[in-house]
Amino acid sequence: VAKGIYSVNNDSHCRFNAVSRQYQYKIFNEKNPFLQQTVYYFPYKVDMEKLQAAAELIKNHTDFTSFSKRNTQTKTNFCSITYSQWSFQNECLVYNVTGNRFLRGMVRGLVATMLKAARGQLTIEQFKTVIESRNCINADFSAPSHGLFLMKVNYSSDVLLLSQEHGHVL
């Protein structure tokens, strides 16, 4: 939902001037034809404590090379994650993550690898090792795109132009 339209400087860039982004990934454990285009159907039991532990661990790291696509043109794989948490909302398992930037495919890779830990296919220590290995081969699959949503993008106030007439952001 668009909550406002703002004027910006002519040299502003919607991607490069953003100071943070928030993503949400939704998972449903029962088949539902009304949700199949917007939620990842994942019929397996998961350990919420392990999911939360993995999500918490993500905030302690900045190098996400293990969750980057190969042969990308990014100059750095460093990202600062400020919020990372799983919850239940309307019978969906929901992952919310906020950071200053994200690599292409990073959230989907993180979700898939955390789900492996939550199913007992990886320990939390092994999950940490995947992150620290800085090798994208170790995070070998990603969750489908249809569960992922960009929820919010924040910009610093100096990017937004003030209305000279009203003295506030347009």
For each predicted feature, which ranges?
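Structured-RNA-binding interfaces characteristic of tRNA pseudouridine synthases
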Residues: V1-L170
